[in-house]
Every structure is written in C-alpha cells, then in structure tokens.
Amino acid sequence: MEKFRVYGQSRLTGTVDISGAKNAALPILFASILAEEPVILTNVPDLKDVETTFKILRKLGVNVECAEEPGKVLIDAGNINQFVAPYELVKTMRASIWALAPLLSRFHEGQVSLPGGCTIGARPVDMHISGLEKMGAAIELDEGYVKATVNGRLKGARIYMDKVSVGATLSIIMAATLAEGKTVIENAAREPEVVDTAIFLNAMGAKISGAGTDTISIEGVERLAGCRHRIVPDRIETGTFLVAAAISGGRITCRGTKADTLEAVIEKLREAGMQIDITEDSITLDSLGQRPKAVNIRTMPHPGFPTDMQAQFTLLNVVAEGTSKITETIFENRFMHIPELIRMGAKAEIEGNTAICHGVEHLSGAQVMATDLRASISLVLAGCIASGETIVDRIYHIDRGYERIEEKLRGLGARIERFSD
C-alpha cells in the first residue's frame, strides 16, 4: 500500500495551478449519458474517482477518449447498450449513484449497485430514490442494487427536499431534463458545482433556471445534443492551498480559480489574521510570517462554510493562537482526523458534533492513517509543518480528490515523497 513520507518544518510559498473541480466533473460526466451526440469536456482533473467514472461509462457502452491535451475528454453516449453500473466499479465511489437518473430519464431503465466511498457517516440514497419515484419511476432494491424503471418518459413534479442535498439535487435535475413537463425542486442545493452542471446541461439544450438558488425549475425537453464545456476550478483544492500558506507562515497564489465560490472560507482566513488579495482568476494568501488566530467554524450548505474544508481548518485551529470550536452539521463521524492530529501533539477533544481545539505552537512528526479524502490532506499538511518525519498511510483517499498533490506541494517547497511498503 502506498504512503507519503513528509519531512516537516517547511514554509510553503509560491504559485499553484488549481485543477478542475472533482465535485463538478463527476456529475457532468454522468450527465453526458443524457446526450445523443458527442460532448467535449476540458479542465477535467486526473483523479481516481474520475478514472472510476470513465470505467463505469465505458461499461455502459459510452465511448470515452482522453485527448493528448491534459484535461480534455471526448464523451460519446450515442451507443449505450448496457444499463447496469456493477458493484465491482461502484463499490469505491458514492458518486456512482448519479448514473441512475440519466439512464432512467433517457432509456427508461437503470440499475446501480449501492455505492461506497469515504466512510464519513450516513449518506443514504433515499432522497435520490424518493425524487425519482415522485416523477413516476418504479424503484426496487434487490441484492444490493437499486433498480429503476418507468413506462415512457418521467413526469415533471414539484419536489421538496427535506434536507439540502447536493447529490439528490443533481440526480433530480438530470432526471428532469428529459421528463415530460415541468419539475420544480424546492430547498435545492446551491453549490457552485450544481450551477456548473446546470450550465453544462443547458449548453446541450436543457431548460434549467434558478440553479444557485434554493428553487430550481426544469422544463423537460425531448432530446439533448452535444456541447463543449469547461469544468469550473476546484474551490476545495483552492481553500486547501490557502490553508497550507496560513499554517506554514508562507505565501501562496492559487492561479486559475474564482474567489466568489469561496467567500465563507476567505472570510474565516481573514478573521484568522491572513492577508488575502484577489484578482479575476487568482487568490493570494500571505501569512506575513504570523501564526494564525483561532476561528470558530460551523459547517453549512453553500453559501455557508463547506464541510469539505472542515478538516483543513481543524488543522489550522490546532496550531493557531487561542481556543476554537468547530461544529460539523453536514456529516456525522467526520472528525476521524482529530485522533491522528493528537498523535502529532495537537490538543483537542470531541463533544458530539463539535470539536474544541486548543492551539499549540508546534506539532511533531508521527505515523498517521488517512480515513477519508479531506482528513488525509489535513494530515499531509500537518506533516509539512511538524518537526521531524511524518508517514501518512492509506493515501489512496488523497488520489481520489487531489490531482498530482505531491508534485504541487513540492513546487511550494514541501519535502514529500510517495513510497510503497
């Protein structure tokens, strides 16, 4: 199994190019199933989850071609001949549930194995299923598979989301694009990745309005054509590198990114005493060589503070001046990085869905284990600033969501290497 060896006490400084957003690339790749003509995508990140999605699409009969130009992918779903996303591919990635709605909407049937992915608590597919049922689908759970069928086209419906869910919002949008009549999603997720997926679908001929608000309307059309689309920059990768500068006394410019998708994170970094400069396509954080100040965090759906930045800010708070509280309202069981940080000398305790962090001046290198994608990057960054050597185990989690992470960190001055047992 591959691991990272990180030599600490690095001040991370320089410029880093931000990749396309995984959380936009995955739904957009699955949404390409809806198109009868080829689609060209650019700025697609080279990640394990993207690779898994390619495999699922190919299994369905989609032609997926990666161009020589990095990040450019041609998708042709004109000859889909299979309607089952099998367990051996789906088991590693929860996002594979997004194959169901486009298969059902275009071909009136689909089967997806119940998915896997990060072990950060309950992420049930119930909201995906109930939304499809309201549009006329017949759903059954059989031997670990979600099987969906519909006689003719799905029917537009008014769907209220009991809980804000990015995944379910995207599933219903995909289903509604080819449905008969109008679908209205109330209490919809507002994340930038939902907006990007809607822009992509509209470029293919869908009629979606309201994406980015809590009420999204979709007027069904009979077919979708091809298009060309560029995936939005990864706001979570951007935030991760900004935190890297803040905790290491460094200065990092994130290039090819957008500040308007990261306002809650930028506000908290400024509250922590960091100097931030913004241009149209870059964000620079200068720590001015100062230790960050502790900041209280409460994760919320967009435009609130993103849960995918919680682990990175936990790290910031355990090395900050002062005491802070971090409350996780989105996912249960998402503090598994804290016991690992404690092994490195952090002082923190967990009370229910809240972590209390008492800032210390220094962390010490240790052997630690990654438990999920965002927790794993916080441990790597902790290793960059700790004294001595840190070994991070189970780094396959990082490869699911961060493109060329060790190469990018080395470009900023980190001393990090990948090795196998």
UniProtKB/Swiss-Prot annotation:
Its EC number is 2.5.1.7. It is an enzyme of class 2 (transferase). GO terms for biological process: cell division; cell wall organization; peptidoglycan biosynthetic process; regulation of cell shape; UDP-N-acetylgalactosamine biosynthetic process. Pathway: Cell wall biogenesis; peptidoglycan biosynthesis. InterPro entries: Enolpyruvate_Tfrase_dom, Enolpyruvate_Tfrase_sf, MurA_subfamily, RNA3'P_cycl/enolpyr_Trfase_a/b, UDP_GlcNAc_COvinyl_MurA. PANTHER family: UDP-N-ACETYLGLUCOSAMINE 1-CARBOXYVINYLTRANSFERASE. Belongs to the EPSP synthase family. MurA subfamily. This is UDP-N-acetylglucosamine 1-carboxyvinyltransferase. It comes from Mannheimia succiniciproducens (strain KCTC 0769BP / MBEL55E).
